[in-house]
């Protein structure tokens, strides 16, 4: 019972960290990165489709992305979706490929991005704390049901807190790394 609770706790916390890493990857740090287009979806034959499924994305230069559609007829739809995604980039098309020039970030924009990264990190910390609360509630129910003793409850609650602290520390490390990446000129 308690092993299941701890395994579920770790699994959910790891998923929360993975989600944060995906969110951080989508925050552009002033250099071209294929992850910049992760959240861009294109309406293609009536269905929302991620741009990665419609085109090859490469980084030929530090400040340029090259989007090569597999189906040339989708190029206008992809261009429109990139423009509507409000990524702060200027895509241009020559009919065969889309070139996205990633402009250098201003100091003000860098600070906004750091603030956004910190907000994402705080949301992840809240998720981790909610997972901790759920695990502690499950342990208390197990104790009331007589599945574990009061001493076991204390011991497992300490384990839950140790896991929580470990994942919060990981979030802080990821945030510091992303902040450094964003502020690097």
Curated annotation (Swiss-Prot):
Tell me the Gene Ontology biological-process terms attached to this UniProt entry. Answer: translational termination
Please give the superkingdom of this protein's source.
Answer: Bacteria
Which keywords label this protein?
A: Cytoplasm, Protein biosynthesis
The entry's localization annotation reads: Cytoplasm
GO cellular component terms, semicolon-separated: cytoplasm
Q: Do you know which InterPro entries this protein is assigned to?
A: Ribosome_recyc_fac (IPR002661), Ribosome_recyc_fac_dom (IPR023584), RRF_sf (IPR036191)
Q: What is its main location?
A: cytoplasm
UniProt key word Protein biosynthesis: yes
What molecular function terms (GO) are annotated for this protein?
ribosomal large subunit binding
Q: Can you tell me which family this protein belongs to?
A: Belongs to the RRF family.
What is known about what this protein does? Responsible for the release of ribosomes from messenger RNA at the termination of protein biosynthesis. May increase the efficiency of translation by recycling ribosomes from one round of translation to another.
Q: What is this protein called?
A: Ribosome-recycling factor
Please tell me the species this chain comes from. Answer: Macrococcus caseolyticus (strain JCSC5402)
Lineage at the top is: Bacteria, Bacillati, Bacillota, Bacilli, Bacillales
Q: Which gene encodes it?
A: frr
């Amino acid at each position: 019972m308690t092993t299941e609770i701890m395994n579920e706790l770790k699994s959910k916390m790891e998923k929360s960290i993975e989600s944060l890493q995906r969110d951080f990857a989508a925050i552009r740090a002033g250099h071209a990165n294929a992850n910049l287009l992760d959240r861009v979806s294109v309406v293609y034959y009536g269905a929302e489709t991620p741009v990665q499924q419609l085109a090859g994305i490469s980084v030929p230069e530090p400040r340029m992305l090259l989007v090569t559609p597999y189906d040339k007829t989708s190029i206008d739809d992809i261009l429109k979706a990139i423009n509507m995604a409000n990524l702060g980039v200027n895509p241009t098309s020559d009919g065969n490929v889309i070139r996205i020039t990633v402009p250098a970030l201003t100091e003000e924009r860098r600070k906004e991005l750091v603030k956004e990264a910190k907000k994402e990190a705080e949301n992840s910390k809240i998720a981790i704390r909610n997972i901790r609360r759920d695990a502690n509630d499950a342990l208390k129910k197990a104790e009331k049901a007589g599945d574990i003793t009061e001493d076991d409850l204390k011991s497992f609650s300490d384990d839950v807190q140790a896991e929580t602290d470990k994942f919060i520390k990981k979030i802080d490390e990821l945030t510091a790394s992303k902040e450094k990446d964003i502020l690097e000129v």
